[in-house]
Amino acid sequence: MAGDSRNAMNQDMEIGVTPWDPKKIPKQARDYVPIATDRTRLLAEGKKPRQRYMEKSGKCNVHHGNVQETYRYLSDLFTTLVDLKWRFNLLVFTMVYTVTWLFFGFIWWLIAYIRGDLDHVGDQEWIPCVENLSGFVSAFLFSIETETTIGYGFRVITEKCPEGIILLLVQAILGSIVNAFMVGCMFVKISQPKKRAETLMFSNNAVISMRDEKLCLMFRVGDLRNSHIVEASIRAKLIKSRQTKEGEFIPLNQTDINVGFDTGDDRLFLVSPLIISHEINQKSPFWEMSQAQLHQEEFEVVVILEGMVEATGMTCQARSSYMDTEVLWGHRFTPVLTLEKGFYEVDYNTFHDTYETNTPSCCAKELAEMKREGRLLQYLPSPPLLGGCAEAGLDAEAEQNEEDEPKGLGGSREARGSV
């Protein structure tokens, strides 16, 4: 009996029966067809359109839907108002002042109505709470004069109205709070360093090429302003969906890309454009990615540049991203820095330009094995680029190899040359 159940279980696993409800699969994985095997569960990818995780401008394409606990936004009301767009912020700014003026204007009119001041308009012997207050419009104007502290003119409060004096104190205090809150919100929104990021540039493409006999992923950053970014730092992340060995689908998994954190190269002195380099080593997520695999993979590299604005001391952040189609294999960036009389000049017309260079099409793992076996000479610069010393070094190495070979097996140089 136990053997029959075990055989039935094995048959179910072989034919690919899925034990879970497809409706419970995450939304990001619904375009994938689950396949069950005896070792692991794989997801066969279906056709779906590509979508950027982050725009080139730094805007994240993430929408927060079905948020039920909306009260959390009200608990942090100041940040919520600052994050609003300008048109909504100005609308809230106008509505708050208008509502407070109308509210206190109604209370001033209500006091005058209860005291009977509206029935004795023009009576010289009657002492009203507020002189020359004849209706709701005049009460509304008196509320504006009180809250904005522009000074009383035709309408003024009298000393025979204690409830009016208390209301005057309350409106003055609440008006100051509203002014501090709304003006502070507008000031913070105006002084945000988001516009400073507009003058921080990222290259349109990232490149992969050889640098110091190692494959490197590189991109270029620059600052258009003469005022520098203080304590500038750069970091990068690889955004790529993956599946664990247990069959769990992780959409938009984030993996750190080392751009010099261990050596301090991630701390930038951004006076002129800099090329940020990521060495593709064993710890790199691109360790086993070749040129052919680059065109088959789907990933996105997000780069984040942070620093303090020199003029204000506020933290500024600029972001950009590179999809797999924007990573050029076998390219280098065109130099933009030239030496002039007494200064260095940066030509931003060629900031995004690249040129092709001799780069192996294999992955960094295979390249490291070739280097250990001494088969890396074909990817080094050609002899005219290396100069006479390199040519002499290659000739000396060839002569040394001839001397080391047995005469019976090696033959003469002329014989090998003819072959």
Swiss-Prot record:
Segments on the Extracellular side according to the record's topology features: 112-135, 155-163
Catalytic activity: K(+)(in) = K(+)(out)
Tissues where the protein occurs: Islets, exocrine pancreas and heart. Expressed in the adrenal cortex, particularly the zona glomerulosa.
Site (Role in the control of polyamine-mediated channel gating and in the blocking by intracellular magnesium): N179
Stretches the record annotates as Disordered: 390-419
Membrane-spanning ranges: 87-111, 164-185
Residue positions where Phosphoserine is found in the record: S5
GO cellular component: I(KACh) inward rectifier potassium channel complex; plasma membrane; voltage-gated potassium channel complex
Effect seen on changing Y152C: In HALD3; results in alteration of channel function with reduced channel selectivity and membrane depolarization; increases expression of CYP11B2 and its transcriptional regulator NR4A2
Composition bias, Acidic residues: 394-405
Top-rank taxon, per record: Eukaryota
Substitution effect: L168R: Found in aldosterone-producing adrenal adenoma samples; somatic mutation; results in loss of channel selectivity and membrane depolarization
Residues in compartment: Cytoplasmic: 1-86, 186-419
Record-level GO BP terms: membrane repolarization during atrial cardiac muscle cell action potential; potassium ion import across plasma membrane; potassium ion transmembrane transport; potassium ion transport; regulation of heart rate by cardiac conduction; regulation of monoatomic ion transmembrane transport; ventricular cardiac muscle cell membrane repolarization
Compartment annotation: Membrane
Membrane-topology descriptor: Multi-pass membrane protein
Protein's job: Inward rectifier potassium channels are characterized by a greater tendency to allow potassium to flow into the cell rather than out of it. Their voltage dependence is regulated by the concentration of extracellular potassium; as external potassium is raised, the voltage range of the channel opening shifts to more positive voltages. The inward rectification is mainly due to the blockage of outward current by internal magnesium. Can be blocked by external barium. This potassium channel is controlled by G proteins.
Disorder: Long QT syndrome 13: A heart disorder characterized by a prolonged QT interval on the ECG and polymorphic ventricular arrhythmias. They cause syncope and sudden death in response to exercise or emotional stress, and can present with a sentinel event of sudden cardiac death in infancy.
Annotated PANTHER family: G PROTEIN-ACTIVATED INWARD RECTIFIER POTASSIUM CHANNEL 4, INWARD RECTIFIER POTASSIUM CHANNEL
Family membership: Belongs to the inward rectifier-type potassium channel (TC 1.A.2.1) family. KCNJ5 subfamily.
Summary of subunit composition and partner proteins: Associates with KCNJ3/GIRK1 to form a G-protein-activated heteromultimer pore-forming unit. The resulting inward current is much larger. Associates with KCNJ6/GIRK2 to form a G-protein-activated heteromultimer pore-forming unit.
Protein name: G protein-activated inward rectifier potassium channel 4
